[in-house]
UniProtKB/Swiss-Prot annotation:
GO terms for cellular component: ribonucleoprotein complex. Belongs to the NOP10 family. One of its GO terms (biological process) is pseudouridine synthesis. Keywords: Ribonucleoprotein, Ribosome biogenesis, rRNA processing. This is Ribosome biogenesis protein Nop10. InterPro entries: H/ACA_rnp_Nop10, H/ACA_rnp_Nop10_sf, Nop10_arc-typ. It holds the Pfam family Nop10p. Gene3D superfamilies: H/ACA ribonucleoprotein complex, subunit Nop10 (2.20.28.40). One of its GO terms (molecular function) is snoRNA binding. Involved in ribosome biogenesis; more specifically in 18S rRNA pseudouridylation and in cleavage of pre-rRNA. The keyword Ribonucleoprotein applies.
Length: 51
C-alpha cells in the first residue's frame, strides 16, 4: 500500500501531488512512521525531538 496524502511544509496544505499547487514547494508524506516496540533507534528520535 502506497501512502498518497502529502502535506506542504511551508503552507501546511494537504495535497496528493509531489509539488504544492499553492506555493510550488516540495511536499512530504502526511503519514507517521510505523510503530514497532523493537525499534532500535527510538532513543535517538526522542532525544532529537525533545532536546
Amino acid at each position: 500500500m502506497r501512502f498518497q496524502l502529502r502535506k506542504c511544509s511551508k503552507c501546511f496544505q494537504y495535497t496528493l501531488k509531489e509539488i504544492c499547487p499553492k506555493c510550488k514547494e516540495q511536499t512530504i508524506s502526511a503519514h507517521p512512521a510505523k510503530f514497532s516496540p523493537d525499534d532500535k533507534y527510538m532513543r535517538y528520535r526522542l532525544a532529537e525531538r525533545y532536546n
